[in-house]
Amino acid sequence: MSKKLHIKTWGCQMNEYDSSKMADLLGEYQGYTLTEDASEADILLLNTCSIREKAQEKVFHQLGRWKTLKDKNPNLIIGVGGCVASQEGKAIKDRAQCVDIIFGPQTLHRLPDMIEQVRRGDKAVIDISFPEIEKFDRLPEPRAEGPTAFVSIMEGCSKYCSFCVVPYTRGEEVSRPLDDIILEIAQLAEQGVREVNLLGQNVNAYRGATHDGSICSFAELLRFVAAIDGIDRIRFTTSHPIEFTQDIIDVYEDTPELVSFLHLPVQSGSDRILTAMKRGHMAIEYKSIIRRLRKAREGIQISSDFIIGFPGETKEDFADTMKLIEEIGFDHSFSFIYSARPGTPAADLPDNVDMEEKKQRLAILQDRITQQAMRYSRHMMGTVQRILVEGPSVKNPMELRGRTENNRVVNFEGLPKHIGTFVDVEIVDVYTNSLRGKFIRGEDEMDLRRSLRPAEILAKRKQDDELGVTQFKP
């Protein structure tokens, strides 16, 4: 009988990535298979997020539900990871006696060892340290699950915005070596991945060591990734305006693999609030970045993050945010009402904005962004869009689902052979959260760059050597 693993994940895309690595780690080294049913699992892992208010209480409520499962099965192992574990490790140990393992984002690679400690009788094994980039050296080889993949290029953040817990829960910025990233992406490309999304709390702060001891910038990394055979699209998230430098903007001008879509959080359009947030830039500097981006890449679309009701936010401050939204023409946003995070400088500021006022402002902002997004979508009517087909449609499995460069989901009638490839579709209808497409042509009719996968290169070398025609020279 196979051993079962259940993972519940809350929070950002980095957490989703970490959870997938936990599954790979325990699957390869200990033979666990994933299950959606917590009641049949031998190990339960909760990967937590501390960004939103009452994150800790949400964790304890979930652990209370899992405790009933452990009461029935004393051999059940329960682990808590992620940012709440980093922040509240001792509190979890004290309040939730059912928890066996507490680990941070940087120590998930030690899970097999921690599980063995529990099996030997140790109680509440805790490891929430920050051992820099060690975890990537201990993870199994990447495994593709479809034509798109996430690849972590760095961990942590050193910006210390006044509202944010990330530097305290994930540590300061640490970049992975260039060669490790390129190898992982090449392995994914060999498995059929066509699009990679480079992950980090602040990806444009990437400074990775190279094999010769020099440092690779984020702009240089983007060009290296674009040169990998099989990779035809590159996305990245998340970035910070103060390090969105001209060399990164230049990549948009000469690297077509980099999509015409950027998520660049601004949080507020008010200079006064940006200063209180310790963002390190003003609204005019953000607008300058977007202006230069649109000069380098015509038609690029921008999404952002907004915090509504930050302590001291006045009606004038909010008006500045709405003005910025109109000037930039954001296509999408992640917008939230401010919630104080314990241990951050902003938590000590007087929260003097009425909650009803916050809710009204949030509704106004989200309504404006939705209007702008629909306007962009309507402009796509009748155009031909190149999409990467990711799989069957969510609502109708007899149809296919793909994604445009500007991150819109398109559903269309097509053949299963198109999954994992690019197709051109004409946009024939527009909905709030998706588009409707009509199939025009498949990849075999496109003028795409000919990709030579590593296996083909090796086969060609072997054939040439056997024939004595050529000799491979690196």
From Swiss-Prot:
Required co-factors: [4Fe-4S] cluster
Free-text cofactor note: Binds 2 [4Fe-4S] clusters. One cluster is coordinated with 3 cysteines and an exchangeable S-adenosyl-L-methionine.
Molecular-function GO terms, alphabetical: 4 iron, 4 sulfur cluster binding; metal ion binding; N6-isopentenyladenosine methylthiotransferase activity
Function: Catalyzes the methylthiolation of N6-(dimethylallyl)adenosine (i(6)A), leading to the formation of 2-methylthio-N6-(dimethylallyl)adenosine (ms(2)i(6)A) at position 37 in tRNAs that read codons beginning with uridine.
A GO CC term attached to the entry: cytosol
SUPFAM superfamilies per record: Radical SAM enzymes (SSF102114)
SMART domains (UniProt xref): Elp3
Domain MTTase N-terminal: from-to ranges: 3-120
Enzyme class: transferase
Domain Radical SAM core: 143-375
Quaternary structure (record): Monomer.
Sequence ranges assigned to domain TRAM in this UniProt record: 378-441
Binding site for [4Fe-4S] cluster 1: 12, 49, 83
EC assignment: 2.8.4.3
Domain of life: Bacteria
CDD domains according to UniProt: Radical_SAM (cd01335)
Alphabetical list of InterPro entries matching this protein: Elp3/MiaA/NifB-like_rSAM, Methylthiotransferase, Methylthiotransferase_CS, Methylthiotransferase_N, Methylthiotransferase_N_sf, MiaB_methiolase, rSAM, rSAM_horseshoe
Record's protein name: tRNA-2-methylthio-N(6)-dimethylallyladenosine synthase
